[in-house]
UniProtKB/Swiss-Prot annotation:
Transfers the gamma-phosphate of ATP to the 4'-position of a tetraacyldisaccharide 1-phosphate intermediate (termed DS-1-P) to form tetraacyldisaccharide 1,4'-bis-phosphate (lipid IVA). It is an enzyme of class 2 (transferase). The gene is lpxK. This is Tetraacyldisaccharide 4'-kinase. One of its GO terms (molecular function) is tetraacyldisaccharide 4'-kinase activity. Its EC number is 2.7.1.130. Pathway: Glycolipid biosynthesis; lipid IV(A) biosynthesis; lipid IV(A) from (3R)-3-hydroxytetradecanoyl-[acyl-carrier-protein] and UDP-N-acetyl-alpha-D-glucosamine: step 6/6. Belongs to the LpxK family. One of its GO terms (cellular component) is plasma membrane. GO terms for biological process: lipid A biosynthetic process; lipopolysaccharide core region biosynthetic process. It comes from the Bacteria. ATP binds at T58, V59, G60, G61, S62, G63, K64, T65.
Length: 337
């Protein structure tokens, strides 16, 4: 099913034309919904601290999680105490839940588990993002909220909007769901503060982001190595929005990938499934996949950690905008744009 969806959205499959009427319905619903917030007919909560929303206008992964981790480190380096909120996709969450270090991806979602394992940031997950943010403010004294994947969650007021776009897939066929991958039309990009292109060329006013490999680490956490033998044959797997990007990266770095297998984004794994895939060869995966495999990982299962890299100009503009928000926050209200 996922293969067919990708063909429709990214390869011009003729089924897209049959789905277009449903896309018009979806577009009308989203237009009306956003308009209700703009007109004040639906309530939007304004928080006492700045809110940075990191999202996209497409379905599927685009590199938001590395971007969130980058922002955490950037803000900390400049004296801020950030916290993160997220829906916790794929987890069964009643209300809101604080994400503990080494939390199970089953309990909190794979991306929150990865973010906290990497950064140790205070993080709360749940569908009620305003409630999650208030927990961070009350219990952790955070002075900036980063909302992971909340661009269309208009009940939460925001001060800075940042959209991450996959530099390979871009916006696909540029149709709204279900004929295309778009949650909102391309026009929405004109309203946001920052557009970041992950692994591709940026247009004027946009910023490029590259994912730079750092270390190969054991999934079970027992070994950290920087001298992994790239000459040995291995199997690669990825359950992310664009698995091909990961496989291409391994090939470009000289890894001897004899088999690659892409899973659906947020895929749940079991030991037998992955042992059958690897067949005693080393298994290389993404960091996001690794947090779901820690409990049953074999000693020759590895993941490649990556860091987001952006320009100093991005840092300067983001921090400048944030300082403006901080200065104006007292007594001001920031509505939806």
């Amino acid at each position: 099913m996922q293969t067919l969806v990708n063909k429709i959205w990214y390869q011009g499959h003729p089924l897209q034309w049959l789905l277009l009427p449903l896309s018009f319905v979806f577009g009308f619903i989203t237009f009306v919904r956003r308009g209700l917030f703009q007109l004040g007919l639906k309530a939007q909560t304004i928080l006492p601290v700045p809110v940075i929303v990191v999202g996209n206008i497409t379905v599927g992964g685009s590199g938001k999680t590395p971007m969130v981790i980058y922002l955490i480190e950037l803000l900390r380096a400049h004296g801020f105490n950030p916290g993160v909120i997220s829906r916790g996709y794929g987890a069964n969450i009643d209300g809101v839940k604080q994400v503990a270090y080494n939390a199970s991806a089953t309990d909190v979602g794979d991306e929150p588990a990865m973010i906290v394992a990497r950064s140790g940031v205070p993080m709360v997950v749940g569908s009620k993002r305003v409630e999650a943010a208030n927990v961070l403010i009350a219990e952790h004294g955070v002075d900036v909220i980063i909302c992971d994947d909340g661009l269309q969650h208009y009940a939460l007021g925001r001060d800075i909007e940042l959209v991450v776009i996959d530099g390979q897939r871009r916006l696909g066929n540029e149709y709204l769901l279900p004929a295309g991958p778009l949650r909102e039309g391309p026009w929405r990009l004109k309203d946001v503060d920052f557009v970041v292109i992950n692994g591709g060329n940026a247009d004027v006013g946009q910023f490029e982001m590259q994912l730079a490999p750092t270390q190969v680490k054991a999934v079970d956490g027992n070994i950290i190595t920087t001298d992994f033998d790239k000459s040995q044959p291995l199997v690669a797997m990825a359950g992310i929005g664009n698995p091909t990007r990961f496989f291409d990266s391994l090939q470009a770095q000289g890894y001897q990938v004899v088999l690659s297998h892409g899973f659906d984004d947020h895929q749940a794994y079991d030991k037998k499934q992955l042992c059958d895939l690897a067949k005693d060869l080393p298994l290389m995966m993404t960091e996001k996949d690794a947090v779901k495999c820690r409990d049953f990982a074999q000693e020759n299962w590895w993941y490649l950690a990556v860091n987001a890299k952006l320009s100093p100009q991005f840092d300067e503009q983001l921090l400048s905008r944030l300082h403006e928000v901080v200065a104006a926050k007292q007594g001001n209200s920031h509505g939806i744009r």
